Curated annotation (Swiss-Prot):
GO cellular component, one term: cytoplasm
Name by which UniProt lists this protein: Adenylosuccinate synthetase
Residues annotated as catalytic: D13, H41
Described function: Plays an important role in the de novo pathway of purine nucleotide biosynthesis. Catalyzes the first committed step in the biosynthesis of AMP from IMP.
Location(s) in or outside the cell: Cytoplasm
Entry binding sites for GTP: 12-18, 40-42, 304, 330-332, 412-414
Residue ranges the record marks as coiled coil: none
Functional pathway: Purine metabolism; AMP biosynthesis via de novo pathway; AMP from IMP: step 1/2
Residue positions binding substrate: T298, T299, T300, G301, R302, R303, R304
Signal peptide start-end: none
Entry GO MF terms: adenylosuccinate synthase activity; GTP binding; magnesium ion binding
UniProt xrefs under PROSITE patterns: ADENYLOSUCCIN_SYN_1, ADENYLOSUCCIN_SYN_2
């Protein structure tokens, strides 16, 4: 038995969906532990392209239990649409489970999220407008609605009475929006509750039962380390904790249940929305990476900002998450480049630093110090073993591993499952295994 956490080591969109899908073959339970519909992952199975926001990637395996944990915030309308999409594609959803204590994104959360972002003007933070921040805010203020509340009309009415009145007041008086009709909201969300009822479980109890039965458990994070509420580029962050420690809180388990932590990072760097990005590229090279990498958000469709691999934030992700190994994705996107650069340090106000500044203002002033490496100018998409890669591609991977001081366990060379080189099984491999490439 081995229990593994998969996290994003950059600003999200690293390809966690594909890696989780790959690892789900060895997992009995897959747990999504934080985030909401602001995340998105794309899975390619044969000729099918499936885009999911809430439901874990492991749903493609009929024997796997897929659990949406207590640390997530759930938009039931979106979740039900995903269920319908999966059923239409003949995918068995009998293993899908939803934590009774997960908080629910209500219609006023979305309206307030969008209105707040519009009001910020030039100081916008780049929210997806899906209501995630306001949902987590209500949770922290003990004013939220949970999944279990949708299963009981009297409880929902009682729980919703004061929050809805307060939100309507805010919508009308501050944002000049129309108020929501309480009866319509109650009717709509009771229907969602009825449809989701068969999937609702006690999250922590379900996970501990699986652990007692010596099942392999995979904890799937959303977004990425640099978007973490406490450890990211605040305030340009998400409203939850994507780092590995968030798995314990969001799933209701102790840290001793976790055996290994695997990070996922692209062979370059991307970011969606606002916030500092030291290695960001401009012009034709940015366009080339964006087009070859298909860098458009699963959730918003927004074009991602592209840049060179940042080894400073890579090392930071290794430390903050306690990574045992890392998966490098989209190596093939670099196939046509003559020269590839990697950020090895920053210059901040004339001083060389090799750490991630805690202040977003300081981070925005950081200038990257690059190491240039030769490109390989040949396709890697069909390589099946490390030995098949061009020597310069091997050297690039070795450089990243040595820079971050973490072994590379997986190399992804495209969207399909078979475009993957597994160096070391992250679920059953030893902790901090040596890289041998």
């Amino acid at each position: 038995m081995a229990n593994v956490v998969v996290i994003g080591a950059q600003w999200g969109d690293e390809g966690k969906g594909k890696i989780t899908d790959l690892l789900s073959r060895s997992a009995d339970v897959v747990v999504r532990y934080q985030g909401g519909v602001n995340a998105g992952h794309t899975i390619v199975v044969e000729d099918k392209v499936l885009k999911l926001h809430l439901i874990p990637s492991g749903i493609l395996y009929p024997e796997t239990i897929c659990l949406i944990g207590s640390g997530t915030v759930v938009d039931p309308k979106v979740m039900l649409k995903e269920i319908e999409m999966l059923i239409e594609n003949d995918i068995d959803i009998s293993g899908l489970q939803l934590a009774s204590t997960a908080h629910v994104t209500m219609p006023y959360h979305r309206l307030i999220d969008q209105a707040m972002e519009k009001r910020r003007g030039e100081q916008k933070i780049g929210t997806t407008g899906r209501g995630i921040g306001p949902t987590y805010a209500d949770k922290a203020q003990r004013n939220g609605i949970r999944v279990i509340d949708l299963l009981d009309e009297q409880k929902l009415r009682e729980r919703l009475r004061i929050p809805l009145a307060e939100k309507n007041n805010v919508l009308q008086k501050i944002y000049k929006e129309l108020p929501l009709d309480q009866e319509k909201v109650i009717e709509e969300y009771l229907e969602y509750g009825d449809r989701l009822r068969p999937h609702v479980v006690d999250c922590s109890r379900a996970i501990h039962q699986a652990a007692r039965n010596r099942k392999n458990i995979l904890f799937e994070g959303a977004q990425g380390t640099l978007l973490d509420l406490d450890h990211g580029t605040y305030p340009f962050v998400t409203s939850s904790n994507p780092v590995s420690g968030g798995a314990c809180i969001g799933a209701g388990v102790g840290p001793t249940l976790i055996d290994r932590v695997i990070g996922v990072a692209k062979a370059y760097t991307t970011r969606v929305g606002e916030g500092p990005f030291p290695t960001e590229l401009e012009g034709s090279l940015n366009d080339q990476l964006c087009d070859r990498g298909g860098e458009y958000g699963t959730t918003t469709g927004r074009r991602r900002r592209c840049g060179w691999f940042d080894g400073v934030i890579g090392k930071y992700a290794v430390e903050v998450n306690g990574l045992d190994c890392i998966a490098i994705t989209k190596l093939d996107v670099l196939d046509e480049l003559e020269e590839i650069k990697v950020c090895v340090a920053y210059q901040l106000d004339g001083q060389k630093i090799e750490y991630f500044p805690s202040s977003a203002e300081d981070f925005s002033r950081c200038k990257p110090i690059f190491k240039s490496l030769p490109g390989w100018k040949s396709s890697t998409a069909e390589c099946k073993r490390l030995e098949d890669l061009p020597p310069s591609a091997m050297a690039y991977l070795r450089f990243l591993a040595e820079l971050m001081e973490v072994p590379i366990a997986i190399v992804s060379l495209g969207a399909s499952r078979d475009q993957t080189i597994v160096v070391e099984d992250p679920i059953h491999g030893p902790k901090r295994a040596l890289l041998n490439i």
